[in-house]
């Protein structure tokens, strides 16, 4: 589902977004959160493992409303990020990002060339199963994908100024 990321706009405009973590698989929960006015939810796939089909169903539930689905992946690996985004998530949150290098890698994994190294497959759900011009889709996806490096350790706090120098790794 091609959908503009309203959460990125709220952040860019300095606004306040309301969201929550979701730790179980029921697409109606995603739908209800959107209906009652939440701006986003983070599908926690780090602490609660669900298969890709379940993740897609949760994102489909979100797509019935205006809520932004973000997937917290298990680890900072290109395939983890790729599968979440190809499933239709409008962003990824990656745990335990401690260094500038890790944050930069994450940003590259989440964006298509020229901004990153994300693998391109036009036939996936996020690309509307190939029904959108590929150049338009790549531009749209790069502009609308939210990338969140989750700072959870003392090491990250010590490196935060350096991590924040790469704006692509934050938003």
Which residues does each predicted region cover?
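N-terminal amphipathic alpha-helix/helix-capping segment at the start of soluble metabolic enzymes
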Residues: 1-19, 132-144
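Active-site mouth loops of central-metabolism enzymes
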Residues: 11-27, 69-74, 145-162
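Glycine-rich, proline-tolerant flexible connector loops at the mouths of alpha/beta enzymes
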Residues: 29-57
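Non-catalytic positions within long, well-ordered alpha-helices that form the structural scaffold/packing
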Residues: 34-35, 85, 164-165
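Short beta->alpha connector loops at strand-helix junctions that form conserved
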Residues: 43-46, 73, 94-97
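Alpha-helix-loop-beta-strand connector modules within alpha/beta enzyme cores
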Residues: 52-86, 110-116, 140-142
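Conserved anion-binding
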Residues: 79, 91-167
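Conserved small/polar residues in nucleotide/adenosyl-binding loops
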Residues: 170-171
């Amino acid at each position: 589902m091609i959908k503009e990321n309203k959460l990125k706009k709220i952040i860019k405009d300095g606004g306040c977004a309301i969201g929550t973590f979701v730790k179980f698989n029921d697409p109606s929960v995603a739908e209800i959160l959107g209906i009652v006015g939440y701006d986003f939810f983070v599908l926690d796939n780090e602490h609660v493992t669900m298969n890709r089909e379940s993740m897609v169903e949760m994102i489909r539930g979100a797509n019935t409303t205006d809520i932004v689905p973000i997937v917290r992946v298990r680890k900072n690996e290109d395939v983890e990020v790729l599968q979440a985004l190809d499933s239709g998530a409008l962003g990824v949150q990656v745990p335990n990002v401690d260094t500038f290098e890790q944050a930069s890698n994450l940003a590259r994994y989440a964006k298509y060339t020229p901004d990153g190294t994300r693998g391109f497959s036009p036939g996936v759900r996020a690309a509307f199963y190939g029904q959108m011009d590929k150049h338009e889709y790549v531009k749209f996806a790069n502009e609308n994908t939210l990338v969140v490096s989750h700072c959870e350790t003392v090491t990250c706090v010590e490196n935060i100024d350096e991590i924040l120098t790469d704006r692509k790794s934050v938003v």
